[in-house]
């Protein structure tokens, strides 16, 4: 089967804000990375995960820096996650908000899995990137992973009455030449490299303290919209897979329906 990994176009909201801070021309950057500007105008459009990773690297390279991912996270907007973002903002507590992103993560992207491991004192959110079937390479780049984790921490800081910070962050790559030294400043906690997993841990009590903006009625209506959105995504995924399969087989001649079915 030909996989298609994508992210919600809402990610372009904080990316554009970050580009404005870094004095980078948004439209030119999108064009250079093969992203259509029309995707920015459609809140339900999907963008190739690979293209977005290239866009992040493009901005770092242009300014000869390494921390564009953190600037993106600092510019978090609920619309980044579509309806899910607003449902998370109206959650009873941070634990409920994180459980929603565990459940509806596909709205944000289909590039990884998210699992919350709950303990009496510590909760851990584990992110596992999917792999490209043909190369076994992780779909998410290191900077894409940083954006996702840092965005969740920024969200928690926006919603919580606490000066929220994780207890620790674990990353599965090396900090060669202190390239990622800036992460400690943002997360304000221990950042461990060369680990067997990608995760961050939080105090369970803090995660379960009520949020001032909690509203069950709002979250119920938003979850209905999210379920409908997921249904549309599933249909679109099938269409995209068929298109990719046809494209892959064209060099071998016009594929038959049977050929395509075998690839799905």
Residues covered by each model-derived region:
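N-terminal low-complexity or simple alpha-helical regulatory segments
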Residues: 1-126
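Surface-exposed, interaction-prone regions with an acidic/low-complexity signature
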Residues: 2-17, 132-134, 141, 145, ...
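N-terminal regulatory/effector-sensing and dimerization cores
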Residues: 82-204
């Amino acid at each position: 089967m030909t996989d298609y990994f994508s992210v919600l176009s809402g990610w372009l909201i904080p990316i554009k804000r970050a580009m404005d801070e870094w004095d980078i021309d948004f439209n030119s950057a999108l064009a250079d990375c093969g992203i259509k500007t029309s995707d920015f105008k459609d809140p339900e459009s999907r963008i190739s995960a690979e293209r977005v990773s290239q866009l992040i690297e493009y901005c770092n390279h242009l300014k000869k820096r390494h921390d564009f991912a953190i600037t993106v996270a600092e510019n978090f907007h609920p619309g980044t996650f579509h309806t899910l973002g607003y449902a998370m903002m109206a959650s009873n507590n941070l634990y409920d908000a994180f459980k929603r992103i565990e459940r509806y993560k596909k709205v944000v992207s289909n590039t990884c899995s998210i699992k919350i491991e709950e303990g009496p004192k510590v909760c851990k959110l584990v992110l596992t990137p999917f792999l490209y079937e043909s190369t076994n390479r992780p779909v998410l780049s290191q900077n894409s992973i940083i954006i996702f984790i840092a965005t969740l921490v920024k969200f928690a800081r926006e919603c919580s009455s606490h000066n929220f910070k994780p207890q620790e962050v674990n990353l599965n790559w090396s900090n060669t030449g202190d390239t990622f030294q800036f992460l400690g400043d943002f997360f304000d906690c221990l950042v461990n490299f060369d680990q067997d997993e990608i995760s961050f841990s939080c105090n369970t009590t803090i995660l379960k303290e009520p949020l001032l903006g909690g509203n069950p009625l709002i979250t119920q209506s938003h979850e209905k919209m999210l379920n409908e959105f997921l249904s549309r995504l599933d249909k679109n995924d099938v269409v995209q897979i068929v298109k990719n399969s046809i494209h892959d087989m064209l060099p071998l001649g016009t594929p038959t329906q049977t050929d395509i079915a075998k690839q799905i």
